[in-house]
Amino acid sequence: FARAYGELDKDKVSAREQTSDSDARKGNFMVDLKQVRGELAEQSLIPGAYCQDYETFKHIYRFVERRLRRAEISSYILLITLTDGNGDFPPLTRREEQMAVLKDEIQISLRSGDVFTQYSSCQYLVMISDASAENVEMIADRICTAFYKAIGGECQGVLLHHCYPMWPAGEK
C-alpha cells in the first residue's frame, strides 16, 4: 500500500506542476494579448473621421461589404467633388488649398467611426455607417456648409456630392 500511495502522490504532484505550467503559459499568453492590443490600439485619438490612403480605404470598404452580409446595418458612400462652379476642374492654383480645407471640414464634420480618403485631385470618398440616406444627405450638406464658411463667399456652388448605398458583398 505504501508503494501505491507513493505513486498516487507522484501523480498528484505531477498534475499540480502541469497545471502551474499551464497557468504560467496562460499568463504569458495574456501578456502577449495585452501587448498585441496595445500595438493595435490608436495611440492618440484624432477627433472626427478616420482619413486613410485609397488602398487602405478599399480594404475597409471590402470588409464593410462582407459585414453587410451578416449585420443589419446601413452604410453609404458619399462622393464629394470640388469643381470650378461650372462643372469643370478647379484651377490648380486654388485646388490644393481648397482640397486641404475640404479634408479638414470632412474630418471634423463626421463621427470617429466614419472613414474617408482622397479619391482624385478634386474628389473625396466618404464611408458613412449606421445612417439613413436622409441623414447622409444632411451630413453632406453640413460638410458643404462648413466648407463654404471656411473658404469664404467667393466659392459658393463649387462642391457636388452624390450618395450611394453600399451593398453586401456578392449582391451587386
List PLM regions with ranges.
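Active-site-proximal structural segments of metal-dependent nucleotidyl cyclase/transferase enzymes
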Residues: I60-L82, G87-P90
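Amphipathic HAMP/coiled-coil signal-transducing linker helices
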Residues: A15-Y54
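Conserved helix-loop-beta segment at the catalytic/binding core of cyclic-nucleotide signaling proteins
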Residues: R66-R70, L102-A133, G152
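Catalytic/regulatory signature loops of cyclic-dinucleotide turnover enzymes
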Residues: A4, G38, F147-V158
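Active-site loop/short helix in cyclic nucleotide turnover domains
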Residues: L40-I46, I80-R94, L110
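Conserved catalytic/dimerization core of cyclic nucleotide/dinucleotide signaling enzymes
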Residues: A49-T56, D88-M99, F116, N135-V136
